[in-house]
A protein has these predicted regions:
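Extended, hydrophobic alpha-helical segments
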Residues: 1-37, 41, 45-46
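C-terminal structural segments of small proteins and small subunits
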Residues: 57-92
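Unusually extended, aromatic-enriched hydrophobic runs near protein termini
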Residues: 4, 26, 50, 85-92
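Short, intrinsically disordered low-complexity segments
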Residues: 34-64, 69-71
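Intrinsically disordered, low-complexity boundary segments flanking structured domains
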Residues: 24-25, 51-56, 77-78
Length: 92
């Protein structure tokens, strides 16, 4: 399954440590394409593992993670406006 993950981590109450940990977890599973944005192919099992790891760090009252899912990245067309640093083809 093709996924796009975006997160918003608050700087309050030790947010920098949380941000660093969330970034490292996401990097294990997905390709970093922009600040707080990752994309890639994951199985349902990998999505569950990612969710479990992130939930150990995400502070539900301060932080958020959004996961967009698609059966296949062919259903999305990526358009880059401005600086284009990555080598991926498809995006919402």
């Amino acid at each position: 399954m093709y996924v796009i993950l975006v997160y918003d981590i608050s700087g309050e109450q030790g947010g920098e440590k949380v941000l660093n940990k969330v970034f490292k977890i996401c990097k294990k599973y997905l390709t970093h394409i922009q600040n707080s944005v990752f994309e890639g192919e994951l199985s349902e099992v990998q999505i569950l593992k990612l969710n479990k790891e992130l939930n150990e760090w995400i502070r539900k009252d301060l932080d958020s993670v959004i996961l967009f899912k698609s059966r296949n990245n062919r259903w999305m067309k990526k358009e880059m406006w401005g600086k284009n640093d990555d080598a991926t083809d498809n995006f919402i």
